[in-house]
Amino acid sequence: VDASEWTYTTGQIKEAFFKTEGKVQRALILAGTRVDGRQPDELRALNSEVDILPRTHGSAIFQRGETQALVTATLGTPRDMPIIDGLCDEYKKPFFMHYNFPPFSTGEIKPLRGPSRRDIGHGELAEKSLRAVMPATDQFPYTVRLVADLMESNGSTSQAATTGGSLALMAAGVPI
């Protein structure tokens, strides 16, 4: 069929898709299953391992279903603290986290051009969560850098980065 013979508008196609999607979701709910085949009360499989990278201070891999994060912890001296120059006065940051969500983790082929808004936002979310359990600098006078590399993604990537981060911190000997 030649595309010029189609009589449906883009709006009509979107509306039909939306209605079909609603019917499928309703059928799944009534059948008591999720899109991936799990029952409503069934959790995704969990797996974790620490110290998988021998040359880092701490490392962990955390997997929940088809989402996997490889997180490394590196310890430095107080002189290694990055100086943050924002809208207010400069300050030093004893704990910081980088979150990398490369295209291959979702099966996409895109160029890597630095962190995206998503990378920055999810990294801030995970960093804020973990900062709450970090020891005070007078008790633990080190700079701590976490790097979370998402290896696979099927949802809950910031949760995987946060959980993997806590495991990597413990593997590095950080008293959280």
Residue spans of the language-model regions?
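Mobile "lid/hinge" segments at catalytic clefts and subdomain interfaces of large enzymes
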Residues: 169-176
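Glycine-rich, flexible beta-strand/loop modules in the N-terminal catalytic cores of phosphate-handling
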Residues: 52, 57-142
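Short helix-coil transition sites and intra-membrane helix breaks within transmembrane domains
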Residues: 136, 154-159
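A short glycine/serine-rich beta->alpha loop
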Residues: 111-116, 148-156
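Amphipathic alpha-helical transducer elements in NTP-driven molecular machines
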Residues: 123, 159-162
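Extended amphipathic alpha-helical scaffolds
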Residues: 1-91
